[in-house]
Amino acid sequence: MSITLHLPTVLAKLADAQVLEAQGTTVGEAVAEVATRFPNLAPRLRASDGKPYPFVTFYLNDEDIRFQGGFDAPLSDGDELTVVPAIAGG
């Protein structure tokens, strides 16, 4: 499946683009495919074991993937996946 991946500005710098095309049948496959193409971005998207970080939220068509099966959430052609890293501070 071909999807669109939206990156926040802080991560877009690592891929030289804020919007990327990605391939995969699940969110995890699409994230892995992007991580392979952009090695500098990879450690910001997922842990070295391929699992999602608790402080990076992914939204599939504006819905939190944690309520859709996480990285196992299925994808359809044309889906939009948005990456939102947590912001700390005070």
Which stretches of residues belong to each language-model region?
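Ubiquitin-like/PB1-type beta-grasp interaction modules and other compact soluble beta-rich domains
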Residues: 1-89
